[in-house]
Amino acid sequence: MYRERAFNAPARASGVDLLDAAAYGQQSNGDRRGEPRFGGDIERLIGTQTGKVRLLPGTTFVTEIAMRNKIPKKFLDTILLELRNVLCVRRRVHMAGIRLSKPASEIMIGQVIRALDGPLAPIHCASRSAFACDDCNDPVYRQSVLVICHRGKKLGYGVAAWLRNASRVELSDVSRRIIAQHQLRISQRPRAHQYCPASRRNHRNEIEMGGPLRFGIIVRLDRHTQSLVN
């Protein structure tokens, strides 16, 4: 009988649900491994636009993650295979669960970026190992493309510096920032009755007295008067 695989969080760790973030990012990028590009939607992976991705202690099924991101489950399984060596380790436990190989505080964003996107060189000249630039070493084209190659190498240094800074960021820190920003947006969200007069009349601020409807008395605060309504 087929058993659903699950994603088990560590006992006392709260981190970003990397499966959600990776699925959200790779859904729009596709699998273009082997082409020089700049990481494609890495900001979504880090979580600047995915404030809802959050992994609480416990178990999250792969099917639930696929439904939240509206992607096929088989496509999510391929992402799991890419993250297996960096973040996850397969265990022969009940429900065929998968858990983080180490606490979220020890997982660096740079490791995740390298595992999902591979080389981050935007052009051939900016790559040191993955993509070789033949024109940089060709004596015929060397004088004409020297300026371009030099600019490309400087761009590669900037990408490497960005990746080093990202490697210092812990997964748990990103999770706390995402949750705090999400709660702040919810608290600052305006109510409908603040802009619609008709809605303001129908949805006046109601303060319950003596517990929730204990005596059936609700204090309605009007704009000019204050009255008690039984």
Swiss-Prot record:
| Record-linked Pfam families | Rrf2
Determine the domain of life of the protein's source: Bacteria
| Protein name per its UniProtKB record | Uncharacterized protein y4iC
Which terms are listed as keywords in the entry?
Answer: Plasmid
Q: Which organism is it from?
A: Sinorhizobium fredii (strain NBRC 101917 / NGR234)
Looking up SUPFAM superfamilies in the UniProt record yields: Winged helix' DNA-binding domain (SSF46785)
